[in-house]
């Protein structure tokens, strides 16, 4: 609760690798368009011994700004296009079929679904087991600290699972909680 009696809301955009582990994040107030967070996130991550070849995202990231940011860094993207009246989406891109499914070239659908599943898996784990969506501290810096702590726990679980010789538990926050 803020001092004015209004609830302060923040959002976090994070990049997840193909194994479903976070690579980095950036936080902003809830009223900032998520598309504006893509470039700062890529600036922070790309070049720090991290090579990004392909990015998958929801249709909300379909914009020239995002596509230009990815193209300037030589990163391919699998982002479905929204269906808009008066616009015919090219057949070589994914299009949103309904809220969850996409249609388009089969190879892009397979890639998109696999990468989105890893991202959604991380979202589900941190929201259900680490109360990620119940952030109560004030301030954007505290939101960043909250994200860092949550991701430290995610990595700690993976490390402990490896040390125990139980790689099947690397995603199981509940097992170690």
Model-derived regions, located:
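A short, polar/proline- and glycine-enriched secondary-structure boundary/capping micro-motif
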Residues: 33-38, 89-90, 173
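Helix-centered, glycine/charged polyanion-binding patches within enzymatic domains
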Residues: 59-129
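Alpha-helix capping/termination and helix-coil
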Residues: 46-49, 74, 130, 160
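Polybasic low-complexity intrinsically disordered regions
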Residues: 1-72
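Basic, amphipathic alpha-helical segments enriched in Lys/Arg and hydrophobic/aromatic residues
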Residues: 109-177
